[in-house]
Design a protein with these regions (language model features):
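Protein-protein interaction and targeting regions used for scaffolding, dimerization, and localization
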Residues: 1-19
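Short, charged/polar micro-motifs that form catalytic or ligand-binding hotspots
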Residues: 78-83, 102-106
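Conserved acetyl-CoA-binding loop-helix of GNAT-fold acetyltransferases
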Residues: 79-95
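Hydrophobic, well-ordered secondary-structure scaffolds
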Residues: 73-75, 91-95, 104-106
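Extended, structured, electrostatic nucleic-acid-contact surfaces
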Residues: 70-80
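Terminal substrate-recognition subdomain of acyl/acetyltransferases
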Residues: 21-28, 33-68, 98-190
Length: 190
């Protein structure tokens, strides 16, 4: 059996993402602490290294103003250390729980798309919430309507199968990433 070059590259990328995702223990070993600012209409997480003023990572989310099944959207994301981004996404899912988290509705980087693909394809602990578009292509309900530009841009012709057309939350509730980081003394509220 021959594997095409594009399939092989995809498998390598997926494996790198799995290996690259930082654990809470690894973050603690690097001296990273997470500052959380949660408001009724937004949440921001800063990953800071002890002794440094500059954030090693920043992730912010907020409601969109559209129904979107009550999901919050990533509005800014930056990670300066490999593997930190996926850990911060997991933490944001816990911070905004029980609301689901979704990608930026307009623009998503290739790295972020891989994280969302991983949630869709490989995370049994994460529940997927399918979102409709603004014209009720999937359901007659208004509550799940959401702008789908990023899904339609990345997955032309199959936006409903796109990881970007969904929102994500912990299956059965719980906040395991938050709880582990807090247990390790790596959470600060500002």
């Amino acid at each position: 059996m021959r594997i095409s070059e594009s399939l092989l590259r995809g498998l390598i990328r997926e494996n790198l993402l799995t290996e690259a995702a930082m654990t809470p223990t690894q973050a603690g070993g690097l001296g990273i602490k997470f500052q959380i600012r949660k408001y009724p209409d937004s949440a921001v997480i800063y990953a800071r290294k002890e002794g440094r003023d500059m954030a090693m990572g920043t992730l912010s989310s907020s409601p969109t103003g559209d129904p979107c099944s009550d999901a919050w959207e990533i509005v800014f994301s930056q990670a300066r250390i490999d593997g930190l981004g996926p850990l911060m996404y997991d933490l944001m899912i816990d911070v905004i729980s029980p609301r689901p988290l979704m990608s930026d509705r307009i623009e998503v980087s290739k790295d972020a798309k891989r994280v969302w693909d991983y949630y869709r394809d490989r995370r049994g602990d994460i529940e997927q919430v399918q979102l409709d578009d603004e014209v009720n292509t999937l359901t007659p309900d208004y509550d799940d309507n959401c702008y789908q530009k990023s899904a339609k841009l990345h997955d032309k012709g199959n936006w409903t199968g796109s990881s970007l057309s969904k929102a994500y939350r912990r299956r059965g509730g719980g906040r395991p990433t938050f709880d582990e980081l807090q247990h390790l003394g790596l959470i600060e509220f500002k």
